[in-house]
């Protein structure tokens, strides 16, 4: 991969100032103060909210506490989506800090998966990495790794260790020089305006004539409504890690530098703010 390490670091250390507030109908023994945290964009809510849980449990009786879950403006937050994706998709046009409501009751079974432990997050994360490598390298790279390498990827993410994670992850970002890129680009496109969870299709980084495919090429093929017509008004923002990459950006470069730790490009299509 091309070595733009500053980009990788900026992506990894991206943070979202967040205010956690206990839901008003939760039963407490005294008033629950809000809890403030800088959330890592590349992580998952269930990995980084132990302190939030402890903070609110201090003012609650044990019998009033069941499985914790989070919500933003009425939408339950999926723990298996990276934090940065949740913010870009649901709150990118709102003021900071991001206001998240904490619940300990009435778990929304229809909307959320249960997360009994961090093992569930690890299993989901490794499953995504394996799927991404199946697309990129027919699973050859991830399958040639030892179990300790898989563990190092997970521990690097869990403990927020950039160098520990990238020492192994860089192998997943390599490809034979004669091929100009991966077999397929692992991506998922999310929209708030549809019931479908996300769009995911096979898409090559290089065209048959050797030209590099761009972000715009991908969108025009799989989500044309996200791209404004040349003479038309821009109706959507295309967000990755809180920024709007230029549509001319090569998809291979984006995959190498703006993928989340699970090796997927998580792309949010949100309505253009009207202000």
From Swiss-Prot:
Protein's UniProt keywords contain Oxidoreductase: no
Record bears the keyword Membrane: yes
For this chain's UniProt record, which GO biological process terms are given? aggrephagy; antigen processing and presentation of endogenous antigen; apoptotic process; autophagosome assembly; autophagy; axonal transport; blood vessel remodeling; cardiac muscle cell apoptotic process
Q: Name one Pfam family in it.
A: ATG5_UblB
InterPro entries in UniProt: Atg5 (IPR007239), ATG5_HBR (IPR048940), Atg5_HR (IPR042526), ATG5_UblA (IPR048939), Atg5_UblA_dom_sf (IPR042527), ATG5_UblB (IPR048318)
Q: Which GO terms describe its cellular component?
A: Atg12-Atg5-Atg16 complex; autophagosome; axon; axoneme; cytoplasm; cytosol; glutamatergic synapse; membrane
Q: Name one GO molecular function term.
A: Atg8-family ligase activity
Membrane topology label: Peripheral membrane protein
Keywords, sorted A to Z: Acetylation, Apoptosis, Autophagy, Cytoplasm, Immunity, Isopeptide bond, Membrane, Ubl conjugation
Q: Where is this cross-link: Glycyl lysine isopeptide (Lys-Gly) (interchain with G-Cter in ATG12)?
A: 130
The record describes its post-translational modification as: Conjugated to ATG12; which is essential for autophagy, but is not required for association with isolation membrane.
Compartments in which it is found: Cytoplasm; Preautophagosomal structure membrane
Tissue/organ expression: Ubiquitous.
Tell me the residues on which N-acetylmethionine occurs. Answer: 1
Subunit structure of this chain's protein = Forms a conjugate with ATG12. Part of the minor complex composed of 4 sets of ATG12-ATG5 and ATG16L1 (400 kDa); this complex interacts with ATG3 leading to disruption of ATG7 interaction and promotion of ATG8-like proteins lipidation. Forms an 800-kDa complex composed of ATG12-ATG5 and ATG16L2. The ATG12-ATG5 conjugate interacts with RAB33A; this interaction is bridged by ATG16L1 and promotes ATG12-ATG5-ATG16L1 complex recruitment to phagophores. Interacts with TECPR1; the interaction is direct and does not take place when ATG16L1 is associated with the ATG5-ATG12 conjugate.
Report the sequence similarity comment from the record. Belongs to the ATG5 family.
Q: What does this protein do?
A: Involved in autophagic vesicle formation. Conjugation with ATG12, through a ubiquitin-like conjugating system involving ATG7 as an E1-like activating enzyme and ATG10 as an E2-like conjugating enzyme, is essential for its function. The ATG12-ATG5 conjugate acts as an E3-like enzyme which is required for lipidation of ATG8 family proteins and their association to the vesicle membranes. Involved in mitochondrial quality control after oxidative damage, and in subsequent cellular longevity.
What is the official name of this protein in its record?
Autophagy protein 5
């Amino acid at each position: 991969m091309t070595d733009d390490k500053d980009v990788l670091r900026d992506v990894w250390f991206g943070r979202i100032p967040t205010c956690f507030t206990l839901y008003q109908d939760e039963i407490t023994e005294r008033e629950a103060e809000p809890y403030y945290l800088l959330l890592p964009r590349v992580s998952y809510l269930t990995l980084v909210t132990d302190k939030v849980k402890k903070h609110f449990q201090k003012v609650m009786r044990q019998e009033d506490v069941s499985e914790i879950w989070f919500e933003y403006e009425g939408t339950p937050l999926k723990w298996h989506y990276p934090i940065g994706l949740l913010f870009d998709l649901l709150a990118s046009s709102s003021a900071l800090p991001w206001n998240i409501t904490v619940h300990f009751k009435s778990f929304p079974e229809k909307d959320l998966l249960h997360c009994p432990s961090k093992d569930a997050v690890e299993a989901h994360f490794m499953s995504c990495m394996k799927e991404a490598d199946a697309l990129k390298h027919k699973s050859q790279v991830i399958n040639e790794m030892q179990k300790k390498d898989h563990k190092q990827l997970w521990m690097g993410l869990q403990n927020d260790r950039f160098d520990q994670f990238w020492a192994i992850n860089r192998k997943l970002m390599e490809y034979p020089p004669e091929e100009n890129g991966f077999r397929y680009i692992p991506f998922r496109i999310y929209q708030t305006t549809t019931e479908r969870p996300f769009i995911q299709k096979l898409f090559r980084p290089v065209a048959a004539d050797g030209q590099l495919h761009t972000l715009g090429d991908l969108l025009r093929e799989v989500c044309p409504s996200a791209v404004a017509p040349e003479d038309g008004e821009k109706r959507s923002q295309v967000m990755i890690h809180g920024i709007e990459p230029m549509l001319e950006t090569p998809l291979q470069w984006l995959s190498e530098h703006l993928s989340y730790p699970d090796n997927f490009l998580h792309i949010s299509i949100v309505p253009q703010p009207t202000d």
